[in-house]
A protein has these predicted regions:
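Substrate/ligand-engaging "lid" and interaction regions
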Residues: 1-183
Length: 183
C-alpha cells in the first residue's frame, strides 16, 4: 500500500494532474497495505479431469488452495464499515498496522517452508505434509519453528504458539499436496 501510494503520487506529478487532483486523491482515496496468507500450491494436476467435468469447461488457470485464508488490511476504522468483507464470512482483519501479522507469517510460515524445502528434497521427501510426518524431518521442522523462530518475535507467546500449531496443521493438510520444490 505504501509503495503504491508513492507510485500514484509520482504519476500525478508525471502526468501534471495538478495540486487539486493530488489533494482530492489524498483526502478522498484510500490506498492500504495488505497481507494475504493462504497456501496456494498451484495447478491441481491430479484432479484437473474431475474439475473440468464438474465445471463443464476447460479452465487452464485453475489453482488449488487450502481452505484457510487470512486477509489483513491496514486501514482506519471507518474502512471496515465501508468495506465489510469480514461480515461475508471471510477471515479479514482491519488493523492499525499489518506489520506484526507480516512478521508472524513470514517467520512462522515462510520460515519453516524455507527450512524444510531443501532438506526434504535432499532426503527424497517431495511433499510438505510428508516432511512434517517424517520421523527426523518432522522433529527438525518442529524444533526450528517452536525452539528458534518463535523466540525471535515480539508478540504474545500464547498467540505465537497457537499460530505455529495452526501452521503445522496447515502443513499436514491431507488434501493439499504442496511440493517442496515449488517453495
Amino acid at each position: 500500500g505504501h509503495k503504491l501510494k508513492e507510485t500514484i503520487y509520482q504519476y500525478i506529478d508525471l502526468w501534471q494532474l495538478g495540486e487539486d487532483f493530488k489533494t482530492w486523491f489524498t483526502e478522498c482515496c484510500g490506498v492500504y497495505a495488505t497481507l494475504v496468507d493462504r497456501i496456494v500450491p498451484g495447478f491441481p494436476r491430479k484432479e484437473i479431469d474431475s474439475i473440468k467435468e464438474k465445471l463443464q469447461y476447460n479452465d487452464n488457470l485453475v489453482v488449488q488452495a487450502e481452505i484457510f485464508h487470512l486477509w489483513v488490511i491496514e486501514a482506519p476504522e471507518p474502512v471496515a464499515k465501508e468495506f465489510p468483507a469480514d461480515k461475508a464470512g471471510l477471515n479479514v482483519l482491519f488493523v492499525p498496522s499489518e506489520e506484526p501479522y507480516h512478521q508472524r507469517k513470514v517467520t512462522l510460515l515462510n520460515g519453516p517452508h524455507t527450512v524444510l524445502a531443501p532438506v526434504s528434497w535432499l532426503s527424497g521427501v517431495n511433499i510438505v505434509r510428508d516432511a512434517c510426518q517424517h520421523d527426523i524431518l518432522g522433529k527438525y521442522i518442529h524444533k526450528v519453528m517452536f525452539g528458534e523462530l518463535l523466540e525471535t518475535l515480539n508478540l504474545p507467546k500464547e498467540e505465537l504458539v497457537q499460530f505455529g500449531n495452526d501452521v503445522m496443521e496447515r502443513f499436514n493438510n491431507p488434501f493439499v499436496d504442496h511440493s517442496v520444490v515449488s517453495i
